């Protein structure tokens, strides 16, 4: 039923089955397996990226040639592949769903203590982690962070990429823990 993400490599053929079922299925190719760090405090260690783009990607099934589910459609992406702009999709590998599947089916969410949340939207900019925006009334807004601020460190640990910033943040304990953030403001 499920395929293991570790068995899929760049260049492998897969099928994207979105809204409309088999009639709208699309043969695609895995063009990358890599980290995906979302600006909205979201991180996948090994997302699957496919091309060409399937227009009904949200929640679409990514299936291998043996009919095994290997991913769930998450995002439309535009990236440079072999020097050319490529439109495609990003899929959450089923491997990351399996450990929390029972919780999702029973409770509608992952159980356990919630992670710390800053309420900040970040992006990578020339080797720096920069605030893109802050959530109204969130911890970052309360602390006075503003768009354009650089996050230089979290809990005295220097951060230079968004994905690393989320990892450092989430290692600090459960939601509600006080987290020192070093900010550089121009």
Where are these regions (language model features)?
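Conserved active-site neighborhood of the chymotrypsin/trypsin-like protease fold
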Residues: 1-25, 47, 56, 127, ...
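Active-site region of chymotrypsin-like
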Residues: 1-2, 26-87, 116-118, 128-132
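Short, well-ordered loop/turn sites that connect or cap secondary structure elements
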Residues: 2, 8-9, 63, 145, ...
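Generic structural signal for buried aliphatic residues
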Residues: 8-14, 62, 151-152, 179
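A structural signal for short beta-strand/turn segments enriched in small hydrophobics and glycine
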Residues: 11-17, 67, 140, 148-151
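C-terminal cap/linker of serine protease catalytic domains
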Residues: 13-16, 20-26, 65, 69-125, ...
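PDZ/PDZ-like domain segments forming the peptide/carboxylate-binding groove
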Residues: 51-56, 60-61, 118-153, 157-161
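PDZ-domain C-terminal substructure recognizer with occasional recognition of PDZ-binding tails
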Residues: 102-109, 130, 141-146, 152-154, ...
């Amino acid at each position: 039923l499920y395929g293991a993400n570790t068995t899929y490599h760049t260049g492998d053929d897969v099928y994207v089955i979105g809204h409309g079922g088999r009639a709208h299925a699309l043969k695609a190719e895995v063009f990358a397996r890599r980290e995906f760090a979302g600006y909205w405090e979201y991180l996948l260690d090994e997302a699957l990226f496919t091309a060409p783009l399937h227009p009904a990607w949200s929640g679409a099934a990514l299936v291998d040639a043996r009919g095994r589910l290997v991913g769930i459609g998450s995002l439309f992406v535009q990236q440079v592949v072999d020097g050319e702009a490529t439109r495609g999709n990003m899929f959450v590998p089923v491997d990351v769903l399996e450990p929390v599947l029972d919780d999702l089916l029973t409770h509608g969410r992952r159980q356990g203590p919630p992670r710390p949340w800053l309420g900040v939207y970040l992006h990578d900019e020339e080797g720096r982690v920069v605030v893109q925006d802050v959530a109204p009334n969130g911890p970052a807004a309360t602390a006075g962070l503003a768009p354009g601020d650089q996050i230089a460190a979290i809990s005295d640990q220097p951060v230079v990429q968004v994905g690393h910033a989320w990892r450092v943040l989430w290692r600090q304990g459960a939601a509600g823990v006080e987290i020192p953030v070093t900010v550089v403001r121009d």
